[in-house]
């Protein structure tokens, strides 16, 4: 999710960039979840303050998901704080910490691998996403994705979520639709390729059971002297739990339905964007999602998690 309690960090240039250990981030995130009060760490005070600033314990539809904005060097594997301009050789990434649990979400250990499998599956479905990877340490696997509001180490692009552009109340769950999202794209004069891209994401979310498809999980990017464009997809992961207030059904409706969505419902949306390939896209994504266990095995998702998720996926 992008926005409040999302990915933004202090952009001041006088903040000292320092190397950080991922296990320190995990440790502090765990303590933050168990107690919002002060806690002891093995870091210096200024480093502890900076780590707290880059850690975002955001409450999303699935629960508390600890994230941190970091500067990462792909060649050396070195991690630094991501509050400032990225040093030479570093780029800004968002890391979602694995091995941190809270009572609302339950244990997260293993979900970094699930999100990586979903990333690979989404890419195979033709969905546009930023480069992503797993950072492994101490038997944990943290999902990392490059930030789409940054380019190189310095350039920052303007981003607005669907929610922000339309001045929606994010807390009004089950009040908005994919049709409204497509209409917003028309208002921004986005082209057919963008419409088809969103159609792919919608179909994927239905078949792969990503019910965390709320108004802050779709965004638009405006580059300097450019035009509005659909931002790359993010927060693409399995999010379905029967009985949940948040993810027992889709946040955005499709043809006035949030569950029990049929192929016909998807085709109606396809007709509305004048797509001649909607039936083919649905079949293509259905076949790819049907290979879930291949994607899960590739990144070593545990057998139990892979089976539990596989039982919920749809084929239409």
List each model region and its residues:
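Phosphate/dinucleotide-binding and metal-coordinating scaffold of catalytic cores
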Residues: 1-215, 219-316
């Amino acid at each position: 999710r992008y926005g409040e309690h999302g990915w933004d960090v202090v952009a001041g240039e006088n903040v000292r960039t320092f190397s950080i250990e991922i296990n320190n981030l995990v440790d502090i995130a765990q303590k933050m979840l168990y107690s919002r009060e002060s806690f002891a760490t093995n870091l210096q005070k200024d480093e502890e303050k900076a780590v707290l600033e880059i850690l975002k314990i955001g409450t999303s539809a699935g629960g508390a998901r600890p994230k941190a904005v970091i500067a990462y060097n792909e060649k050396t594997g070195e991690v630094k704080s991501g509050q400032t301009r990225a040093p030479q050789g570093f780029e800004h990434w968002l890391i979602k910490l694995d091995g941190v649990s809270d009572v609302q979400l339950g244990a997260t250990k293993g979900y970094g691998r699930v999100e990586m499998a979903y990333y690979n599956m989404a890419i195979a479905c033709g969905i546009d996403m930023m480069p992503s990877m797993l950072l492994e340490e101490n038997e944990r696997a943290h999902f990392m994705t490059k930030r789409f509001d940054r380019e190189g180490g310095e350039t920052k692009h303007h981003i607005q979520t669907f929610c922000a552009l339309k001045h929606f109340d994010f807390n009004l769950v089950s009040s908005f639709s994919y049709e409204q999202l497509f209409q917003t794209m028309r208002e921004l004069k986005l082209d057919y390729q963008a419409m088809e891209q969103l159609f792919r994401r919608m179909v994927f979310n239905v078949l792969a059971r990503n019910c965390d498809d709320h108004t802050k999980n779709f965004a638009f990017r405006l580059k300097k002297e450019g035009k509005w464009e659909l931002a790359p997809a993010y927060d693409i992961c399995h999010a379905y739990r029967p009985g949940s207030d948040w993810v027992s059904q889709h946040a955005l409706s499709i043809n006035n339905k949030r569950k029990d969505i049929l192929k016909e419902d998807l085709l109606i949306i396809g007709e509305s964007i004048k797509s001649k390939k909607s039936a083919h896209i649905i079949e293509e994504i259905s076949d790819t999602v049907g290979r879930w266990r291949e994607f899960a095995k590739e990144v070593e998702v545990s057998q139990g998690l892979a089976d539990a998720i596989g039982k919920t996926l749809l084929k239409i």
